[in-house]
Amino acid sequence: NTRNDMERNAGRPFLVWGYVTLLTTLLVWGTVVQTGEPRWNLLWLLIPLLGGTLTYFTRGKRTEGRVHTFVDRVLGSVWLVAGLTASFLSLVALFTPIRLPILFVILLTMGMGTAATGLILRFRPAACCGAAAILLAPGMLIVHNDWQPALFAAGFLAMMIVPGHILN
């Protein structure tokens, strides 16, 4: 069942979240650099809003009697943990005085989720692209703050958009 779903529509969530994150990153980066106003960082909240909405509207038709396998549940759990972790830490970074290297944390977390998905499904492109994002993440601790969004966008391009297009 999971293999059939993988062949039919597993690329959609990768593409939705990859493109939403990439475009939001470019929007936030451009507005903050152009205006010098950090309040534009609130645009990061577009990611869960647009990503969740598009995921809902682009999901496949629900078939009656569809069996949810153990692998389906494991993948759901992997992404639930990754998503809740990313959401919680993003809210901490946006709305508290605690300073986190949030782009590093999010890229690392999502890279681990993508790599785990690839390993669980034995889909090598997702495993390798997730690993590439994990390896890219520490670079954001090294580069100047102005260039961190570029690495973040590149990481999402590699870990979500590339495997998503390979699947579709």
Model-inferred region functions:
Residues 27-33, 90-96, 114-121, 137-145:
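Hydrophobic alpha-helical transmembrane segments
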Residues 53-71, 112-119, 161-168:
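C-terminal ends of transmembrane helices
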Residues 116-168:
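Terminal transmembrane helical module of multi-pass membrane proteins
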Residues 1-2, 12-17, 21, 27-32, ...:
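C-terminal membrane-adjacent module
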Residues 39-50, 93-108, 153:
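Structural signature of hydrophobic alpha-helical transmembrane segments
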Residues 70-130:
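Membrane-proximal helix-loop-helix units in multi-pass membrane proteins
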Residues 4-92:
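Selected alpha-helical membrane-embedding segments in polytopic membrane proteins
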Residues 18-22, 26, 49, 84-87, ...:
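Hydrophobic alpha-helical transmembrane segments of multipass integral membrane proteins
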